[in-house]
Amino acid sequence: MVIWLIGLSGSGKSTLANKIVLEANELGNKTVLLDGDVIREIFGDDLGHSLEDRFKNAERICQLGKFLDNQGINVVTAILSLFPESREWNRNNIKNYYEVYIKTPLDDLIKRDSKGLYEKFNKGKISDVAGMDIEFIEPTNADIVIDNSDSIESFLNHAKPIIEKLIHSQ
């Protein structure tokens, strides 16, 4: 199964993904994490953050997800997933695909800003920031939408039903 976590920077994708992967593995379900930032590093940081490069990175992650799923390995991705066509490709090509959109108000993202992206953008130091000068098209067909404007504890409670879905997909 491929669990596809979608959201802007700071939405909690990696936090939720890490919890799902840890707990699924503890329950004996081999599950791997594909994090958009880590995939960039693995491939030698050969891509920038332009739309074209972001699309190439998304294609890599889609293909890796399918490759691992075809071998019976559960996959949890943490990715911006800017492109509706990538999500559609996943639905059409990955047999056990489950899309999760982590919806977080922009004000909360700016407050969290663990990578400093929004601050740098607002100071004019960087560009190509999804949700700011790069349009983020919200998913319209997500299997579940999680509102992450509440506490971290409340947010992480969403891991359990996702793990159950992953376990029962086998």
Task: Indicate residue ranges for each PLM-predicted region.
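Conserved substrate/cofactor phosphate-moiety recognition/catalytic segment
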Residues: 17-63
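Walker A (P-loop) ATP-phosphate-binding motif of ABC ATPase nucleotide-binding domains
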Residues: 2
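The conserved Walker
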Residues: 9
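Hydrophobic anchor at the beta1->P-loop junction of P-loop NTPases
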Residues: 5
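Loop/turn-to-beta-strand initiation segments
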Residues: 30, 70-78, 98
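Conserved lysine of the Walker
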Residues: 13
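Conserved phosphate-donor/acceptor-positioning beta-strand/loop module used by diverse small-molecule
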Residues: 77-79, 90-112, 146
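Small-molecule kinase domains that catalyze NTP-dependent phosphoryl transfer to phosphate-bearing small molecules
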Residues: 103, 111-170
